[in-house]
Amino acid sequence: MNVLIVDDNQSITNMLQKYLSIKGFEVEVSNNGKIGLSLIQKNQYHAVLLDLSMPDFSGLDLIEHLERTDSLKNQTIILFTASSVSNDIISSLLNKDGIKACLRKPVHLAELVQTLSAV
């Protein structure tokens, strides 16, 4: 199962990449929303782990771009974000095609693997 992690926090992406690789996932990482979008457009992923709060080109920007190009419904996106993001925003995002779950940081690794396995 191949997974793309899009998060600007390199320590988080390194930790998640190592853990998921040990669990048998093939993992690619982008520390930038624009590069993440480019990878999504070029490759097929079983799931995309997407941080909402990134500088310059956020996870919300990436989702909006995928919606505009009618590509969101073809994705499996699991959001992960800081607790500062409101529940209303999370609820509205979870109603969009392609967005399957939202995990709050700090992400519990066992919950992440369980969520990935369920999608």
Please provide the spans of the model-predicted regions.
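Active-site residues of response regulator receiver
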Residues: 51
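Short hydrophobic/Thr-rich beta-strand motif most characteristic of the beta2 strand and flanking loop
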Residues: 24-31, 39, 103
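Two-component/phosphorelay signaling modules centered on CheY-like receiver
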Residues: 10-28, 96-97
